[in-house]
From Swiss-Prot:
GO molecular function ontology, one term from the record: protein dimerization activity
EC number: 2.7.7.6
Protein name (record): DNA-directed RNA polymerase subunit alpha
Disulfide bonds: none
Summary of subunit composition and partner proteins: Homodimer. The RNAP catalytic core consists of 2 alpha, 1 beta, 1 beta' and 1 omega subunit. When a sigma factor is associated with the core the holoenzyme is formed, which can initiate transcription.
NCBIfam families reported in the protein's UniProt record: PRK05182.1-2, PRK05182.2-5, rpoA
Record-stated family: Belongs to the RNA polymerase alpha chain family.
Species of origin: Shewanella sp. (strain DB6705)
């Protein structure tokens, strides 16, 4: 059904094609013309830069003092080993960092599955090769992993107190993002008679720690939260001014002359020092009848005039008179 020309179509998640354990295609449609590239580029940048993940941040290898060392009986040098450790796909549950250990002897490849860890750590790619032992060598290392996002070079994590860091504790450039590659394509879509719509196809490759649908959801949430500032732009730049409620109804501050009473009634009230309507409404019928020359006819007139303004005799006004009147 054709909606209003001012209404925007709302896209829906149409399909998730799982190409491999680490690659998937996500399709969303229909999108208004041009929105495919607008949203596709925004989501792509967020998926590459802002997805949370886990990465190796520090490594200690027994017998190694710096990253330019080589280890007897190991095919790779230390720099290559550190690069291989960056390829670990790890998930942490219930903690922000963990210390893993890896100890092995003999010959053959040392795999990610050989790492010792507790139940809060899951290694997604246990077949990932960390190093190859070519001789009867014993290897022992400690690997610190942490949660984060984006890419954090080791140089930015060096602090002033790092001079006390033990020699041999190697800092590693941390690539936290679980998304290794992402591309998007905009195709044509159709809804009823409209043929100029967009279909957004996002081709995503991860390290296996993040589900593609969850990745899209997180990226969209981040984008929406950032755009909230533009939706509430007026509230941010111009704080709402709270109106101060007056202490008394303005009509109570007006003189009794505004009631346009008869001359007789007006003179009787002034003789009793009743100058404002607020003074008058606090008097009772009994009190007014005690006023010289003010009879029942004048009392009825006063009651009718007050009633026409939503007022009556015998009202209680706290803190009367206000300072503006009391000072006069």
């Amino acid at each position: 059904m054709q909606g209003s020309v001012t209404e925007f179509l709302r896209p829906r998640l149409v399909d998730i094609e799982q190409i491999s354990s680490t690659r998937a295609k996500v399709t969303l449609e229909p999108l208004e013309r041009g929105f495919g590239h607008t949203l596709g580029n925004a989501l792509r940048r967020i998926l590459l830069s802002s997805m949370p993940g886990c990465a190796v941040t520090e490594v200690e290898i027994d017998g190694v003092l710096h990253e330019y060392s080589s280890i007897e009986g190991v095919q790779e040098d230390v720099l290559e080993i550190l690069l291989n450790l960056k390829g670990l796909a790890i998930k942490l549950e219930g903690k922000d960092e963990a210390l893993l250990t890896l100890t092995k002897s003999g010959t053959g490849p040392v795999l990610a599955g050989d790492i010792t860890h507790d139940g809060d750590v899951e290694i997604i790619n246990p077949e990932h090769v960390i190093r190859n032992l070519t001789g009867q060598a014993d290897i022992s290392m400690r690997i610190r992993v942490a949660k984060g996002r984006g890419y954090v070079p080791a140089s930015t994590r060096i602090q002033s107190d790092d001079e006390e860091r033990p020699i041999g504790r190697l800092l590693v450039d941390a690539a936290f993002s679980p998304v290794s590659r992402i591309a998007y394509n905009v195709e044509s879509a159709r809804v009823e008679q409209r043929t100029n719509l967009d279909k957004l196809v996002i081709d995503m490759e991860t390290n296996g720690t993040l589900d593609p649908e969850e990745a899209i959801r997180r990226a969209a949430t981040i984008l929406a939260e950032q755009l909230d500032a533009f939706v509430d732009l007026r509230d941010v730049t111009e704080p709402e001014q709270k109106e101060e409620k007056p202490e008394f109804d303005p009509i109570l501050l007006r003189p009794v002359d505004d009631l346009e009473l008869t001359v007789r009634s007006a003179n009787c009230l002034k003789a009793e020092a009743i100058h404002y309507i607020g003074d008058l409404v606090q008097r009772t019928e009994v009190e007014l009848l005690k006023t010289p020359n003010l009879g029942k006819k004048s009392l009825t007139e006063i009651k009718d005039v007050l009633a026409s303004r939503g007022l009556s005799l015998g009202m209680r006004l706290e803190n009367w008179p206000p300072a503006s009147i009391a000072d006069e």
